[in-house]
Swiss-Prot record:
This is NAD(P)H-quinone oxidoreductase subunit 1, chloroplastic. It is a multi-pass membrane protein. It is found in: Plastid, Chloroplast thylakoid membrane. The keyword Chloroplast applies. It comes from Gossypium hirsutum.
Length: 363
């Protein structure tokens, strides 16, 4: 069998073309992931700056002003400083659990961002079980906190880890029941379908008006999941020094610091998606999505508008969360557990039964 030179060149060019296609596919798969990571990083920096400015305004202070214009680079400067701090390990603690705990807390939160739709086109994973995947993944974070508290071999750290686990379990159930009510209303567990179900009547189509009780319960539960005041018992300075973070320093302490703000950003995004209409402009008959489906340029414009609307609603909720920190006093541990088990759980269960009844009657 004789193979001519031209045939060999054709075979080589074919394999080269196939390898280029594989490389292009890998790069195209990494682009949205890297874009999401970059956006999350910028979002966390903005939240830290906003919290410092709003807190300074409430307390009548100046706030950060030297690190960049208006102090916008202060969070970046703090993060850079933590990178070069010494990484101290407890001599009698479990170093494996001590090191793995912060990573579990951060990774579980980062994975949850994959089901957040920033616009009709921009979502990393549009799954049929999107919101329940978020609940399942977010349930892993308290395990990391408990591991950190136990591995530190410190009574304050261990008590902080136990408090974090108890608080998360107490408020995870009402949160799940509220999400289940939204899923019943939208006839879907996909985050994209939930947003589209709210787009028919603009502002009045939001689940906020159809689920006011669920919205309030979700709001309180999400604040408790983020361990924000008045629910910051796992790291109460007056009682536990810094809770499960007491023995940490350097980059590991920075991971916990970032995880708290990532969780706050994630909760705010889910409030926007589940109750505030997501990327929809929410003015009926003014914004027609079909206008932005004509060509690629219009599609990019529509995606940009959707991202802007989603972030605007998200940062509105963030402002409420930050203002709440300086408004309400911290609860006692028994008050926190009673609020979760004796108040929010029955209300969320009743809300779910009402939603189910209305859905059955409407069939």
């Amino acid at each position: 069998m004789i193979i001519y030179t031209t045939e060999v060149e054709d075979i080589n060019s074919f394999y080269t073309l196939e390898s280029l296609k594989e490389v292009y596919g890998i790069i195209w798969m990494l682009v949205p992931i890297l874009t999401l990571v970059l956006g999350i990083t910028i979002g966390v920096l903005v939240i830290v700056w906003l919290e410092r400015e709003i807190s300074a305004g409430i307390q009548q202070r100046i706030g950060p002003e030297y690190a960049g214009p208006l102090g916008i680079l202060q969070a970046l400067a703090d993060g850079t400083k933590l990178l070069f701090k010494e990484n101290i390990l407890p001599s009698r603690g479990n170093t494996r659990l001590f090191s793995i705990g912060p990573a579990i807390a951060v990774i579980s939160i980062l994975l949850s961002f994959s089901v957040i739709p920033f616009s009709s086109r921009l979502i990393l994973a549009d799954l049929n079980i999107g919101i329940f995947l978020w609940i399942a993944i977010s349930s892993i974070a308290p395990v990391g906190l408990l591991m950190s508290g136990y591995g530190s071999n410190n009574k304050y750290s261990f008590l902080g880890g136990l408090r974090a686990a108890a608080q998360s379990i107490s408020y995870e159930i009402p949160l799940t029941l509220c999400v289940l009510s939204i899923s019943l209303l939208s006839n879907s567990s996909s985050t994209v379908d939930i947003v589209e179900a709210q787009s028919k009547y603009g502002f009045w189509g939001w689940n906020l008006w159809r689920q006011p009780i669920g919205f309030i319960v979700f709001l309180i539960s999400s604040l408790a999941e983020c361990e924000r005041l008045p629910f910051d018992l796992p790291e109460a300075e007056e009682e536990l020094v810094a809770g499960y973070q007491t023995e940490y320093s350097g980059i590991k302490f920075g991971l916990f610091y970032v995880a708290s703000y990532l969780n706050l950003l994630l909760s705010s995004l889910f409030v926007t998606v589940l109750y505030l209409g997501g990327w929809n402009i929410s003015i009926p008959y003014v914004f027609a999505p079909e206008l932005f489906e004509i060509n690629k340029i219009n599609g990019i414009i529509g995606t940009t508008i959707g991202i802007f609307i989603t972030l605007a609603k998200t940062y509105l909720f963030l402002f409420i969360s930050i203002a709440t920190r300086w408004t309400l006093p911290r609860l006692r541990m028994d008050q926190l557990l009673n609020l979760g088990w004796k108040f929010l759980l029955p209300i969320s269960l009743g809300n779910l039964l009402l939603t189910t009844s209305f859905q059955l009657l409407s069939l």
